[in-house]
Swiss-Prot record:
Belongs to the G-protein coupled receptor 1 family. GO terms for molecular function: G protein-coupled receptor activity; proteinase-activated receptor activity; receptor ligand activity; thrombin-activated receptor activity. It is a multi-pass membrane protein. It is found in: Cell membrane. Keywords: Blood coagulation, Cell membrane, Disulfide bond, G-protein coupled receptor, Glycoprotein, Hemostasis, Membrane, Receptor, Signal, Transducer, Transmembrane, Transmembrane helix. This is Proteinase-activated receptor 3. The chain crosses the membrane at residues 94-114, 124-144, 167-187, 209-229, 258-278, 301-321, 339-359. Disulfide bonds join 164-243. Residues 115-123, 188-208, 279-300, 360-368 are cytoplasmic. It comes from Rattus norvegicus (Rat). The gene is F2rl2. One of its GO terms (biological process) is positive regulation of insulin secretion. Residues 38-93, 145-166, 230-257, 322-338 are extracellular.
């Protein structure tokens, strides 16, 4: 008897009217008003599904990859979390206020630094290092008005694709150029103080020029992907054009983004940071506390550590976590924090000139 009942139920399910299935499909379609996409997605490469159907959804952006279209994408759809950031006072008021401060202080400070360096005859190594550092900072600062206008305009970029790529390259290029030059300065001071006999045998001017040349070549090569890949996208909602805030994963695939940015943070920050800490701490231990230049070296080292800790460390640590989180877990909830950290990273353009004045005092004491 039970067997007959099961057979009848199975036959009934097999010949279930298609109208029931069609009504169910229509119900699902009607509920998919919000699409879960990310800073790294486009409307053609993601399936749409209601955010309310995600169990335990907390606002982190989740994406479902599908086949990428063959044609180039210039218009994207983003979720409510992304639009919330793009419209927030943090993005349209606080971040541009910090950039204005950096521009107002950084431009004159670096111009004065270059003017002072042009008339300096002592310590050619100091002149070469800080000239390169001031040039990198100044190149970055002159692109800040475009970023300021972008954020004050509600994150609506009006300067075109080329200028968007230029400002993006200037942003990252300045940060990693500053990190590497500060590291080279630490190596130079380490050799001069800890290994003076070896240092005296080196062709100081050519050696310093070589170090700075290698830094610029490395930075230019690492910035090529940012200069080549598309950075500007128009958002259907809220009807703005973003610059570097939204990416298309079909234009820049996830594996490439992950390995590129992680290697950038690893070779551009983590290794130089370890080398800098080693060089400067060894330098402090080598010097006698009674030495007249010891206190100034302490000030210089503290300022360098402040620059690394406030300007460079948060950006690169969050950069690694963000891309690892997005690559392995398919979420990008840390992207807001990363953009804030990137904004704080611009403060190094204001602090570098003060480092020059401290280091110049040390050199003047040594040669007096």
């Amino acid at each position: 008897m039970e067997m007959k009942v099961l057979i009848l139920v199975g036959v009934r399910l097999l010949f279930l009217p298609t109208t029931v299935c069609q009504s169910g499909m229509k119900h699902v379609s009607d509920n998919s008003a919000l699409t879960a996409e990310s800073f790294n997605g486009n409307e053609h490469s993601f399936e749409e599904f209601p955010l309310s159907d995600i169990e335990g959804w907390t606002g982190a952006t989740t994406t479902i990859k599908a086949k990428c279209p063959e044609e180039s994408i210039t218009t994207l759809h983003v979720n409510n979390a992304t639009m919330g950031y793009l419209r927030s006072s943090l993005s349209t008021k606080v971040i541009p206020a910090i950039y204005i401060l950096v521009f107002v202080i950084g431009v004159p400070a670096n111009i004065v630094t270059l003017w002072k360096l042009s008339s300096r005859t002592k310590s050619i190594c100091l002149v070469i290092f800080h000239t390169n550092l001031a040039i990198a900072d100044l190149l970055f600062c002159v692109t800040l008005p475009f970023k300021i206008a972008y954020h004050l305009n509600g994150n609506d970029w009006v300067f075109g694709e080329v200028m968007c790529r230029v400002t993006t390259v200037a942003f990252y290029g300045n940060m990693y150029c500053a990190i590497l030059i500060l590291t080279c300065m630490g190596i130079n001071r380490y050799l001069a103080t800890v290994h003076p006999f070896t240092y005296r045998k080196l062709p100081k001017r050519n050696f310093t020029l070589l170090m700075c040349g290698v830094v610029w070549v490395m930075v230019v090569l690492y910035m090529l992907p940012l200069a080549i890949l598309k950075q500007e996208y128009h958002l259907v909602q809220p009807g703005i054009t973003t610059c570097h805030d939204v990416h298309d994963t079909c234009e820049s695939p996830l594996p490439f983004q992950f390995y590129y940015f992680v290697s950038l943070a690893f070779f551009g920050f983590l290794i130089p940071f370890v080398v800098s800490v080693f060089c400067y701490t060894t330098l402090i231990h080598k010097l006698n506390a009674q030495d007249r230049k010891w206190l100034r070296y302490i000030k210089a080292v503290l300022l360098i550590l402040v620059i690394f800790t406030i300007c460079f460390a948060p950006t690169n640590i969050i950069l690694i976590i963000h891309h690892a989180n997005y690559y392995y877990s398919n979420t990008d909830s840390l992207y807001f924090m990363y953009l804030i950290a990137l904004c704080l990273g611009s403060l190094n353009s204001c602090l570098d000139p003060f480092l020059y004045f401290i280091m110049s005092k040390i050199v003047d004491q040594l040669t007096s």
